[in-house]
Amino acid sequence: MEEKKKQTEPEACKVAKKCGGCQYQGVPYKEQLKKKQKMVNALLSKYGKVEPIIGMENPYYYRNKVHAAFDRDRKGNIVSGTYETKTHRVVPVENCLIEDKKSQEIIRTIRGLLKSFKIKTYDEDTGYGLFRHVLIRRGFKSGEIMVVLVLGSPILPSSNNFVKALRKEHPEITTVVLNINDRKTSMILGEREKVLYGKGFIRDELCGCTFRISPKSFYQVNPVQTEILYQKAIEFAHLTGKESVIDAYCGIGTIGLIASGHAKEVVGVELNKDAVKDAILNAKENQIRNVRFFQGDAGEFMEAMAAEGNSMDVLFMDPPRAGSDEKLKMI
């Protein structure tokens, strides 16, 4: 039992108080679930029965998407990590307890390569420097890894040698993408991209479907829990194969494509054009023909459907953090 405890409950994160990303860090996982259950009950119990939370067997090192901001400390050493709560000061992070271990190894290697290749990190105050962020996405089932290098200009000095050196240390990397963000903004990714190695995207499997994931695509960061979440959503929808389903805020089409085998037809709507492109390609790659995807605002799209007299039987909705459109209250 003592050995099992060591495996499932690592030491408390050393930067948790500065980072602010894990507010319950140091609290035993079972206690975290109890606290969260109380919060959910308080919010939703007036609407119906609240089922018990389904927790993870091992709630560590699960994130398949890892971001690191780069800067220099007071001594001029290159550091990488996350922003301190409510600031843009970089908190150096060597080991995050919820981020994929391999991705963290790659970030540490990149930090060393910046020093070897004499590449300057970007300074947000002065706008001077080149290297801003690294974004890594890993397919937990496919094993494919995408590394996105975010720069303040479109040119990475000695880019071929840089990529070769990176892949020499981590041959598992299947694609490297250069993203250009030359604006003074808190956004991580810019609009322009250039593929330095590989196809510029990765694939992963979820609930039996294969998904193409680009640098800007939304894809759930916890693949283990996502499968449970989607399966439960489809179960609670009581689909019989006769229903017309709408997947609002569909992203790259994950929920809609997985639900398509249980429904008559599925319509997905998403504002992000890159995500819609991936969703259409995902439908083709999975040979799913009863799904259509549209680019647009989910609320406006469904409002227009209602005005035309079109109806759907089931709505799946996974909105962004800001929440769903106010128009949905009227539909």
Predicted segments — roles?
Residues M1-V195, L206, E235-K242, N310-F316, ...:
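SAM-dependent transferase fold signal centered on methyltransferase-like domains
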Residues E2-K6, S158-N160, K164-I331:
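Rossmann-like S-adenosyl-L-methionine
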